[in-house]
């Protein structure tokens, strides 16, 4: 609210995933749904310009989407979003585990590990000319 009052645009973020502690661990699905919807309405009242959330059950996402007064950006929530989104790192395959709704278009984790190993080996063999590479002649 303080940021909004200071004229700074704010996008709210919540959801059912582990990154969202305010929903509460150990609660029933119904309690989580009520908490989620309450948090979304509170963010709207505080003046957010949009809400982002992840992994919300379809029926809850639908209810929130129908009640929302701001744009909704969501991942893993079905069609009930103004703009579906996907985590960039999952899209590029930087994560070993992917959420069931996420599709990887490459395996950059493996490629990054291999590139790093090659770099380390070149350093160990003394093949990197540090002074030249950083512009010190």
Annotate each predicted stretch with a short phrase.
Residues 1-137:
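Alpha/beta enzyme core
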